[in-house]
From Swiss-Prot:
Coiled coil (UniProt feature): 25-102
Keywords for this protein: ATP-binding, Chaperone, Coiled coil, Nucleotide-binding, Proteasome
Function: ATPase which is responsible for recognizing, binding, unfolding and translocation of pupylated proteins into the bacterial 20S proteasome core particle. May be essential for opening the gate of the 20S proteasome via an interaction with its C-terminus, thereby allowing substrate entry and access to the site of proteolysis. Thus, the C-termini of the proteasomal ATPase may function like a 'key in a lock' to induce gate opening and therefore regulate proteolysis.
Organism of provenance: Mycolicibacterium gilvum (strain PYR-GCK)
Family of the protein in this entry: Belongs to the AAA ATPase family.
PROSITE patterns per record: AAA
GO molecular function terms listed in the Swiss-Prot or TrEMBL record: ATP binding; ATP hydrolysis activity
Region annotation (Docks into pockets in the proteasome alpha-ring) ranges: 614-615
Complexes and interactors: Homohexamer. Assembles into a hexameric ring structure that caps the 20S proteasome core. Strongly interacts with the prokaryotic ubiquitin-like protein Pup through a hydrophobic interface; the interacting region of ARC lies in its N-terminal coiled-coil domain. There is one Pup binding site per ARC hexamer ring. Upon ATP-binding, the C-terminus of ARC interacts with the alpha-rings of the proteasome core, possibly by binding to the intersubunit pockets.
Protein known as: Proteasome-associated ATPase
Annotated domain remarks: Consists of three main regions, an N-terminal coiled-coil domain that binds to protein Pup and functions as a docking station, an interdomain involved in ARC hexamerization, and a C-terminal ATPase domain of the AAA type.
């Protein structure tokens, strides 16, 4: 039945089309009731189905909307990042354009700061009074500082002190403490301002020095090299000159008199000359005795001249500490070791300036009451007799400079000069006269007794000794070493054919055979012992037997003698003989006599017409 044909509920029929007034049978009534119940169930199911369909549709829509929102949010974030990056690039490009479009900046040297916060600046060759940018703290500006100027000549930035320029030598600091007299190129003198760091160094007390620490400032003193801007008229910093610092070695040597063998008499002489005046000044004043100003140690090479000079400084420091009641372990003295040949300089006046600086340094140290030893090694190389120069006459000005320092108007208190040379005959006589180098001590070659003393310094009880040698003296190490030394010295000083070294012929026709003992030295003895120790080490590696043997020492003597065979073969045997300590009649012929080697034939060498290099 169609919808139009179905009776309406409002026209007296029920939902199933039956009129309530129509009489029904019991069967029809039961069927009608059954249909009504089924319709009610279907109506409920229909309502439930409609609600389920609507709910599912709404959840699906929500998920779709959420997914779309997430996608839009991601796109939005990506666009934000892109915009931010583009903005940063635009800002960087704008800054780069602004930077490239800026006018050039100038630089100047700050001369002074005024009360109205303006500043005087030296720039472009002119002195100008300029204003400062508001972000510049004028109280923090320092004289001599580099400042940056903009196009309007306004100070916009404070920099560091200038680090390049000309080198000038400080002559003196003026009374105001802010200016100094310096000597520049070609001895041109000028007055310059001192930058604030140099003013602070100039104000340090006299005893203040940087020797106690690398980070501490050092007092500014005449002779220092300064970095100077001659146009601005400012000195910025002290520049240490390496060539001067290297020539002077300030140290307290650790060598004592006990380390020196075979020179007892010479040590006594130098102790009397150096230590007594320092330790007993009252007695010297009481007897009106003037202490010596200098000592000359002369003699052949390798005999201990430099060693004695070091021991003097060490002993003097300890004795002075005992007199003052100080701890001997903290004894202090200064040993200024001057390397003679390196003192020479090709520029006129530089050598003399170095000598002045050396003695100035010595006086500064001595003013504290500390003994100062100024040691000139190879003294003949720089203070030779005036007028004897072959290629130059530098000694004509260097020698007077030393004389004026030793015996000039300005005295030397607590300073003693020690010179060492193996050609004392070449040193200018004015230096050697009394009143300058008063004491002259000859360091001779060691004799047999001295050689035993020297050997005992190197052959000690701590050394490993071979069991076979120890067994000969019942295991007594001291007796074994003593016997080893005696045998070695007897072999070294024996006048046998194996020890013959040279046959020399003098100008008067006399001939003389010289043995190796005539050319022995402490350095040669040390070399012999070192060779023996090396042989003992090789024996351990080869045979496994440990310990030093007497045979090692005897073999070392033979090797040492053999190595010296060709040393006398020089172009000037007379000069070689003088250096070696053989003086007297002029030598014209030399013949080597080393056994086991091919002896050279007799050679006539004229020492007057054939001058050349010597050993």
């Amino acid at each position: 039945m169609s919808e139009s044909e179905r009776p309406e509920a409002g026209d007296g029929t029920d939902a199933l089309g039956a009129s309530p007034d129509t009489p029904l049978s019991s069967e029809d009534a039961a069927e009608l009731e059954q249909l009504r119940r089924e319709a009610s169930v279907l109506r409920e199911q229909l309502a439930d189905a409609a609600g389920t369909i609507g709910s599912a549709r709404s959840v699906r829509d929500v998920h779709q909307l959420e997914a779309r929102i997430d996608s839009l949010a991601a796109r939005n974030a990506k666009l934000m990042d892109t915009l931010k990056e583009a903005r940063q690039q635009l800002l960087a490009l704008r800054e780069e354009v602004d930077r490239l479009g800026q006018p050039p900046s100038g630089y100047g040297v700050l001369l002074s700061v005024q009360d109205d916060e303006t500043v005087d600046v030296f720039t472009s060759g002119r002195r100008m009074r300029l204003t400062c940018s508001p972000n510049i703290d004028t109280k923090g500006l320092k004289k001599g500082q580099t400042v940056r100027l903009n196009e309007a000549l306004t100070v916009v930035e404070a920099g560091h002190f200038e680090s390049v320029g000309e080198i000038s030598t400080l002559r003196e600091i003026l009374a105001d403490g802010h200016r100094a007299l310096v000597v520049g190129h070609a001895d041109e003198e000028r007055i310059v301002w001192l930058a604030e760091p140099l003013v602070a160094s100039a104000d340090l007390p006299d005893g203040y020095d940087d020797d106690l620490g690398d980070d501490r400032p050092r007092k500014l003193r005449p002779g220092d090299s300064l970095l100077v801007d001659t146009k601005a008229g400012y000195a910025f910093e002290r520049v240490p000159k390496a060539e001067v610092e290297d020539l002077v070695l300030e140290e307290v040597p650790d060598v004592s008199y006990n380390d020196i063998g075979g020179l007892g008499r010479q040590i006594e002489q130098i102790r009397d000359a150096v230590e007594l005046p320092f330790l007993h000044k009252e007695l010297y004043r009481e007897y009106s005795l003037r202490p010596p100003k200098g000592v000359l140690l002369y003699g052949p090479p390798g005999c201990g001249k430099t060693l004695i000079a070091k021991a003097v400084a060490n002993s003097l420091a300890k004795k002075m500490a005992e007199v003052r009641g100080d701890d001997a372990r903290e004894a202090k003295s200064y040993f200024l070791n001057i390397k003679g040949p390196e003192l020479l300089n090709k520029f006129v006046g530089e050598t003399e300036r170095h000598i002045r600086l050396i003695f100035q340094r010595a006086r500064e140290k001595a003013s504290e009451g500390t003994p100062v030893i100024v040691f000139f090694d190879e003294m003949d190389s720089i203070f030779r007799t005036r007028g004897t120069g072959v290629s130059s006459d530098v000694e004509t000005t260097v020698v007077p400079q030393l004389l004026s320092e030793i015996d000039g108007v300005e005295g030397l208190e607590n300073v003693i000069v020690i010179g060492a040379s193996n050609r004392e005959d070449m040193i200018d006589p004015a230096i050697l006269r009394p009143g300058r180098l008063d004491v002259k001590i000859k360091i001779e070659r060691p004799d047999a007794e001295s050689a035993m003393d020297i050997f005992s310094k190197y052959l000690t009880d701590e050394l490993p000794i071979h069991e076979d040698d120890l067994s000969e003296f019942s295991g007594d190490r001291s007796l074994t070493i003593k016997a080893m030394i005696e045998k070695v010295v007897d072999r070294m000083y024996a006048e046998i054919d194996d020890n013959r070294f040279l046959e020399v012929t003098y100008a008067n026709g006399d001939k003389e055979v010289m043995y190796f003992k005539d050319f022995n030295s402490g350095a040669m003895i040390q070399n012999v012992v070192d060779r023996a120790k090396k042989n003992a080490i090789k024996a351990v590696l080869e045979t496994g037997q440990r310990g030093l043997r007497i045979q090692h020492l005897l073999d070392s003597i033979v090797d040492e003698f053999a190595e010296n065979e060709d040393l006398p073969n020089t172009t000037n045997p007379d000069d070689w003989a003088r250096i070696s300590g053989k003086k007297g009649e002029r030598i014209v012929y030399i013949r080597t006599l080393v056994t086991g080697k091919s002896s050279s034939a007799s050679r006539a060498i004229d020492t007057e017409s054939n001058l050349g290099q010597y050993l």
